Regions:
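Short helix-loop-beta-strand segments that form the rim/entrance of peptidase-like active sites
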Residues: 19-23, 27, 37-78
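Soluble metallo-hydrolase cores and metallopeptidase-like ectodomains found primarily
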Residues: 1-26
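Structured catalytic cores of large enzymes
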Residues: 12-14, 44-56, 105-113, 134
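Extracellular/periplasmic catalytic domains that process cell-envelope and extracellular macromolecules
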Residues: 16-20, 57-61, 98-100, 128-129
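Metallocarboxypeptidase
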Residues: 65, 70, 79-201
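Phosphate/oxyanion-binding active-site loops and adjacent basic polyanion-contact surfaces
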Residues: 34-40, 114-118
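Conserved protein kinase catalytic core
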Residues: 35, 74, 143-145
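Conserved phosphate/anionic-ligand binding catalytic regions in large, soluble enzymes, centered on
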Residues: 31
Length: 201
């Protein structure tokens, strides 16, 4: 924690970084109508638990991974609504009501205030208890024709962020897109190909 809060000297920080493990937070389901986000958690856990290849074993040995469903109540409400009609052709995810009195389906719009218990709990884990180096929020929506949107995002970036955070995000995005290119997997949107800006991401 002292390392994450920059409460130590540079020499102590380097020593701790050498002996510690990076923490990666992967969540899904924040927007309960984006079903892939929650379902990928199950698939990701299965892949990590069942594979024995060198890369997976190295990840499990060197990284602490937190897999978190961040809106199970919303998912249950959406699931119940979707399964309500017995005739499958009449099922849809266009739930007619906002199912949270204050923030609707969109719990992540509360993170700047932390008014709701859900966002307060997540913020406590991310910024007090665990302080992961990577926080990956899996959503489902993105520009038409894309599979995933990620950094680098379009400018301008938020002036309250240290520029090293932005270049660090860009480096993660570069590693992601390079890996996808190596595996011949198109569909990664970035910069102006995405609707997301660096102001919020």
């Amino acid at each position: 924690r002292k390392l994450g809060r920059a409460e130590i000297t540079e020499a102590e920080a380097k020593a701790l970084a050498n002996q510690g493990k990076p923490i990666v937070w992967i969540d899904g389901g924040l927007h309960a109508n984006e079903v892939v986000g929650a379902q990928q958690l199950i698939e990701t856990l299965y892949e990590l638990a069942s594979k024995n290849d060198e890369e997976t074993l190295r990840i499990l040995d060197e990284v602490i991974i937190l897999l978190v469903h961040v809106n199970p109540d919303g998912m249950e409400i959406m699931s119940n609504w979707y399964m309500l009609p017995s005739e499958k052709t009449k099922r849809n995810k266009n739930i007619p009501v906002l199912y949270q009195k204050y923030v609707g389906h969109d719990n992540n719009r509360d993170f700047f205030m932390n008014n709701m218990q859900e966002s307060t709990n997540i913020s406590m884990q991310q910024y007090v208890e665990w302080m992961p180096q990577i926080i990956y929020n899996h959503h489902q929506s993105g520009p038409a024709g894309t599979v995933v949107a990620g950094p680098p995002y379009r400018d301008p970036f938020n002036h309250v962020f240290d520029p090293l955070i932005i270049t660090g995000l860009d480096a993660v995005g570069a590693a992601m897109i390079n890996r996808l290119h190596q595996e011949d997997k198109p569909g990664f949107a970035r910069l102006d190909g995405s609707v997301f800006s660096t102001w919020w991401n």
